[in-house]
A protein has these predicted regions:
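A structural boundary/capping signal
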Residues: 1-178
Length: 178
């Protein structure tokens, strides 16, 4: 919970002249490089790819089993999102800080529910997408290098899209199938 609270105060964007700046399309693709943990801490933020790396390293350092996942929509923008799920007592704990719309801590007994919840918040029309579990690549990768790493070296994960809802449990929300 403390990790999520701290990261929720961090910014979103690409470092440009010492500041985080939100860039889109070709500007993002040309300027972005995956950040090291120290760069992420220095700039107090990054994009979801950097948040996932930071969360993974933070949890791993504390001995908490976790996986990073990469979603790529097959839309005209090839929209992506990366996220971290920690495993505890047969539940997945999904920590979200970079996707402002759904910041928080979520718990679910089903990866299907977690991924479906994220997809529902990424797009109005969930159709074709890829989901991969990936091992953290080195920092300094370009946009294309990172995306290729996740697609070609990541482990394909197949889920069933389900309708979900959340139940507020105070410090966290539970994601359940409707």
């Amino acid at each position: 919970m403390d990790l999520n609270k701290r990261l929720n105060s961090y910014g979103y964007g690409v470092p440009v002249n010492g500041q985080l700046v939100e860039l889109d399309g070709p500007e993002f693709a040309n300027a972005y490089r995956t950040m090291s943990v120290s760069a992420f801490e220095k700039y107090k933020g990054g994009v979801c790819w950097d948040y996932a790396r930071y969360q993974h390293m933070y949890l791993q350092y504390r001995g908490i089993s976790n996986q990073n996942f990469y979603i790529e929509l097959h839309d005209k923008m090839s929209s992506t999102h990366t996220f971290t799920v920690a495993m505890m007592n047969d539940f997945g704990i999904y920590i979200e800080s970079s996707f402002r719309k759904i910041q928080g801590v979520y718990i679910s007994a089903s990866l299907d529910c977690i991924v479906s919840y994220i997809l529902k918040n990424m797009t109005d029309h969930v159709s074709d997408f890829e989901l991969r579990e990936y091992k953290d690549p080195r920092s300094g990768r370009t946009t294309l290098e990172f995306m290729n790493w996740c697609i070609h070296r990541g482990k394909p994960i197949h889920i069933k899209y389900v309708e979900t809802r959340t139940i507020d449990r105070g410090d966290y929300k539970e994601i359940v199938e409707v």
